[in-house]
A protein has these predicted regions:
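Short, surface-exposed beta-strand/loop "edge" segments at domain boundaries and coil↔beta transitions
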Residues: 54, 69-72, 82-83, 142-145, ...
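Hydrophobic membrane-insertion alpha-helices, especially the h-region
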Residues: 11-16
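Active-site beta-strand/loop microenvironment that shapes enzyme catalytic pockets
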Residues: 94-95, 121-279
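Solvent-exposed coil/turn segments that connect beta secondary-structure elements
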Residues: 68, 104, 199, 279-281
Length: 283
């Protein structure tokens, strides 16, 4: 091979490699532009839904939490004076940075619909056969992830339940295979959702704009958030998310109406019996 041709080929190869490196770097950093860093390991993002709702602004609000820097807390009215209070009040009373519904509750206004245990306290001792996701945190065993959504169709819960102090059972939305497991429905509503991403970060997810569960799962799978799996927490006016840290404060509340009228619907936050909250770990 002539020397001139050799240098031409090598130059072209180097340019291609540089282009690949640049492209890969662009991909790896592309998600960061959607997140506002509030503190180390703590981000807030507001995403435009690709599916527009006829009610409200079609925004999806997400708090991303790195469990390396934050601890998770389950607070239950059954363990704290049996008093239901708003997510904001739960935060103020227990020094939480953020709080979201821990799940749907029964007619008594206190007990979770699915199994719920927090250390020695049992809010609901019975597993719900219809609910296939269990949020687990406060590990007993340092070998397991600090927080995870256990998929009852994919994982051995009987072994894993012994490895965590806190367990919260709810409805599975995104499976361990990243599949939408909800069928389509006509009903639409606001939603609070808990997710985990592929980096092991926890996601507090909220949409005030109402969607069917099936459609909202597809929205989450389409967003640039690297979502791994997700479980349903609450819907309608009971759905709540509160956040306050370093001058960033917001309170998200589900709306009462689920029709197709245009216009904003500003609802007051409902008192709720059970929340998942976060606090910063000591250095």
């Amino acid at each position: 091979m002539k020397r001139g041709c050799f240098f031409l080929i090598m130059s072209f190869a180097i340019l291609q490699l540089a282009g690949c490196i640049f492209f890969s770097t662009s991909i790896s950093f592309s998600e960061e532009i959607f997140w506002n860093k509030v503190d180390e390991g703590l981000f807030v993002g507001e995403f435009d839904s690709p599916l527009k709702s006829k009610i409200n602004d079609s925004k999806v609000t997400i708090v991303k939490i790195n469990p390396k820097f934050y601890s998770f807390r389950l607070l239950c009215a059954s363990e704290h004076s049996r008093a239901r209070i708003t997510a904001k009040k739960w935060c103020e009373k227990h020094n939480l940075i953020a709080a979201i519904n821990a799940g749907m509750y029964q007619a008594d206004g206190i007990k979770n619909v699915g199994f719920m245990r927090n250390f020695s306290h049992l809010n609901n001792p019975r597993l719900n056969d219809s609910y296939k996701a269990i949020l687990a945190f406060n590990p007993v065993d340092p070998a397991v992830p600090e927080i995870q959504i256990i998929d009852l169709r994919c994982q051995d819960f009987e072994k894993l339940r012994l490895k965590y102090h806190t367990l919260i059972q709810n409805i599975r939305m995104i499976s361990c295979r990243q599949e939408n497991v909800w069928s389509q429905q006509d009903k639409i509503w606001s939603m609070a959702v808990f997710g985990m991403d592929k980096n092991g970060d926890a996601l507090f997810i909220f949409t005030e704009a109402p969607y069917s569960g099936h459609d909202f799962i597809n929205i989450l799978l389409s967003l640039p958030i690297s979502i791994l799996n997700a479980m349903y927490l609450e819907g309608g006016p009971e759905a709540s998310l509160y956040f306050s840290l370093k001058g960033v404060e917001f309170e998200k509340v589900g709306i009462h109406k689920t029709g197709f009228e245009e216009g904003p619907y500003n609802a007051a936050a409902w008192p709720i019996p059970n929340v998942i909250g976060i606090i910063k770990k000591p250095r």
